């Protein structure tokens, strides 16, 4: 059976007089004095269908029984709309189809929320429960189409660059040094488990050992971790690895890839992209994920703070803390209520308070005015290049607290004062991360244990491992990390040394990574790679508030699927087959 000759966005004045067939959902229904109007909708657009009672009474009576979201196949003739009745907002707004016959393909129950009135705010949990209906509202499908265009462009680009797409296993071995694994019990081997991949990291490195040279994959990955607006338990990444290269070879390819992906949405990205070291990012922006759409750069104020009598400044200086802040142009107009609000805001991130200093026609107004000489205030204004009506905002705290507090504060103020537009795209490579960091007093890998140290820092592995920098690189866009990668360790002895520093016992190394260490010992080429977060990339491209909006069937913030009611209990017979007993 033929359901349509045209899509619902295709008919124009050029088709007037033609007999056509359309299929779609009843978007809106109106009966105006014996004339039935139906907006018929498919994924591509809307066409107005009309039936007049005085011309076709039986057809009119049948059509009058149709309701929202019923699925119809309609035959009829394309006619011009009456003068003054055109709709310039529709591609089909100058025509309508006079119904000759129609067939109801499917009926719909009463809807849990309106499809046609997509401006109405609907509870997100209800939208996720009825995700297939939420898709019909149009916005979700537009985002999924963007995702498709990005994936298609990625595959074409990577193929042209000589990369081979390889699908790596989903059932693998648990190596829980990173986030928690999702585990899959084995029926054939009772008491043993597979793990779903947090990334194809080991497999893609083994492909380099195997001589593939250049690999990529749009990989689905799984991490059992607490969720945020930009995290899901399962997510997609553009996974890339190449042999016989370094960052000078790989990073330009990634920049061209990013420019190609953004071009699918008509966005031009100037190349090359900016670069800054991890330490520069921390010093100037308080974070390794700086949003460069606006300035508000942080500056170290310790040399000025020590010339004050402010006890909080002096206490932080005595205990190895810092005093830093930024200048807000025109911010001297901020009220005391606003400044008190910012003070409470930074306390959420561990700061004890907020120092403010206003430059008002050359005069100083500050909540620490009595603790610092006028001359020092004016030197601070010159240091920050603060003009009349600017304000300085400073925090005294341990370095990590000051950085985190000021990072969040500068983002908040930039948003409130509209210092950037949503169609700005500011990329930056962050390089030279620490190889290790401290977590609860324990040395852990900053990225993952397969990241190579910078060659000049290798001697520090034995004397000061926390000072070792890594040959790693993150790509940050508007404050979001959208890609992360590194040069890999290809020397088995160096890899074993890294595991030892991480306090992974020889027995544990052999159990979890013995196969990998063995592979490295059979002649491994120098190699490096990167993974781009596909969900985050599309989220930015579509200005979505969450990656849930760019995934067809996402989980909630609590990692549940409200539509399928997953996770769910399973039958006792299934548990028995898997030799599993559930205890709470």
Curated annotation (Swiss-Prot):
CDD domains noted in UniProt: AspRS_core, EcAspRS_like_N
Quick one: which residues bind ATP? 223-225, 232, 481, 533-536
State where the protein is found. Cytoplasm
Check the record and name the Gene3D superfamilies matching this protein.
Answer: Bira Bifunctional Protein, Domain 2, GAD-like domain, Nucleic acid-binding proteins
| EC numbers, comma separated | 6.1.1.23
Q: Which is one Gene Ontology cellular component term of this protein?
A: cytoplasm
A GO molecular-function term, please? ATP binding
A GO BP term here is: aspartyl-tRNA aminoacylation
What does the sequence similarity comment in the record state about its family?
Belongs to the class-II aminoacyl-tRNA synthetase family. Type 1 subfamily.
Q: What is known about its subunit structure?
A: Homodimer.
Record protein name field: Aspartate--tRNA(Asp/Asn) ligase
Give the classification, highest ranks.
Answer: Bacteria, Pseudomonadati, Chlamydiota, Chlamydiia, Chlamydiales
The UniProt gene name for this protein comes to aspS
